[in-house]
Amino acid sequence: MDEVPSSDESKSASSGKRVLEQSVHELEEVFKKFDANGDGKISGSELADILRSMGSEVDEAEVKAMMEEADTDGDGYVSLQEFVDLNIKGATVKDLKNAFKVFDRDCNGTISPAELCETLKSVGEPCTIEESKNIIHNVDKNGDGLINVEEFQTMMTSEMTDKSK
């Protein structure tokens, strides 16, 4: 018999999206502070200035390494989307793993269409098995018809960062 998540677990799963949405909004505000000239992107010099103003002793090589990590499109600047992606992926891995456990009802390391549907229904989201299969199909990188923890993290972070575009 499937174990039904407690109301606390269900609240945790549904509140996870709200927390991520709030995080995106907060990151947008931080981004605006980093973006000293207001051009919608952070340059290496803006990053260095803000880090130094916060008391961080960073050298040019460290700033360059930070920029390379964040600047995924290689244009030499960090866009809002890149900034949000970098911060959400690092900050929420533990939260997402905890949310994954709520969906993985049989604790086998994957979420089946039935588990996805049951969990969504338990938090008041209408769902059919067919809809669950479609959701899974969109994020199922390895083609096994299930969602593993990495695919779940990708699904959740892309859903949140899409809202900041």
Curated annotation (Swiss-Prot):
Alphabetized GO MF terms: calcium ion binding; protein homodimerization activity
Alphabetically ordered keywords of this record: Allergen, Calcium, Metal-binding, Repeat
Superkingdom field: Eukaryota
Expression sites (tissue/organ): Expressed in mature pollen grains.
Domain EF-hand: start-end pairs: 22-57, 58-86, 91-126, 127-162
Binding site for Ca(2+) 1: D35, N37, D39, K41, E46
Pfam families, A to Z: EF-hand_7
Binding positions for Ca(2+) 3 per the UniProt entry: D104, D106, N108, T110, E115
Gene3D superfamilies noted in UniProt: EF-hand (1.10.238.10)
Keyword Secreted among record annotations: no
Residues that, per the record, bind Ca(2+) 4: D140, N142, D144, E151
Residues the record lists as binding Ca(2+) 2: D71, D73, D75, Y77, E82
Quaternary assembly: May exist as monomer and dimer.
Name of this chain's protein: Polcalcin Cup a 4
